[in-house]
Amino acid sequence: VSLSKSKSNTNAHSSLVTDHAESEVSLSAVEKDANHMLIQASIQDSATSDEVDFVHDAVLLPETVAAVLGVKSLPTQAEGNDQNCLNMSGIYVDATFGRGGHSRLLLSQLADDAKLIVFDKDPTAISVAQELASKDSRVHVVHDSFATLTTSLAALGITQVDGLMADLGISSPQIDDGSRGFSFMRDGAVDMRMDTSRGQSVAEWLEYVDEETLANVLYEFGEERHSRRIARAIKQMESYDSTLALAEVIKVAHPNWQRGKHPATQSFQAMRIFINNELGDVDDFLAQSIPLLKVGGQLAVISFHSLEDRRIKQFLQRHSKGQYPEDENLPMPPKRPRYFSKPKRVGPSKTETSRNPRARSAWLRMATRTDSDYVIDDAP
């Protein structure tokens, strides 16, 4: 049963390893971390004290900014050196502002006439973004999902951009704040909405959803093999007002625990993804990147789990090869445009994962927009 809420439409450094339609970039820990401390210090100078923890944890930070700017690497950072800026003009989008780690580093490489449009669903993230915008006229803030990319940019008079970047998934502050409902380690209301100002919470949804639909959600969005057993236990709960109580019920119902992984991990992921329509939004975002990016424009997307990463990989393969799976059995397959160059992939170094364990599952995929004209019928 497909439960997606919206229609799902299915450069870097050296040492490339070919993987189907992508090139995987392998970077040494020494190369990736040579400038890390100075980069982080520079960003933290522009962040308020309560944002520093998140800024420090921004994943694949210089790699993502270099990718969205279309350069191999950022200039060497040096204290007191003002010549470490690329001074690039253009219009760029940070589709997932968070606490602004990637945005701040990107701004440090942009010219005075450049523009940076930042999106986020989270009201707290938007407050941080608005504070940044009040200090930097290049920043424009959109409080909405990146699925609204085209219409939101059009409202600002923008039809095409030079670069798009997104850091998918949940942020550290959201996990660490028990009141948001994302954590099974801290108690709070069973909410899980990225945007607490709109939509229904997971608790409200659990009150009326039937057991079969819940099981399908756990299986489809959490890849939970024991979804039916867990769904049955959840529906037997008297109330849904505590994340710790919900996690305990899942823990008791789960027959097999993977060592080092909480048994509620996949179920919490599934409910969060479903209630926020995360995969549908990713599909919509990727589809809109084709007409929005200028020729030579850069797409850079970080994902943290296989459901997201698989979508990004398949999208870039499809539109870099010009080969659609549905065309394979046709006697005369149509000639499809190749909208992107051969994709590349970057993972975190061992140094980064030791410093920030949440980076372990991260993958950055990137590609360059070709000069193929956009054809509406070829939309994903």
Named regions from a protein language model:
Residues V1-P380:
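S-adenosyl-L-methionine-dependent methyltransferase catalytic core, i.e., the SAM/SAH-binding region
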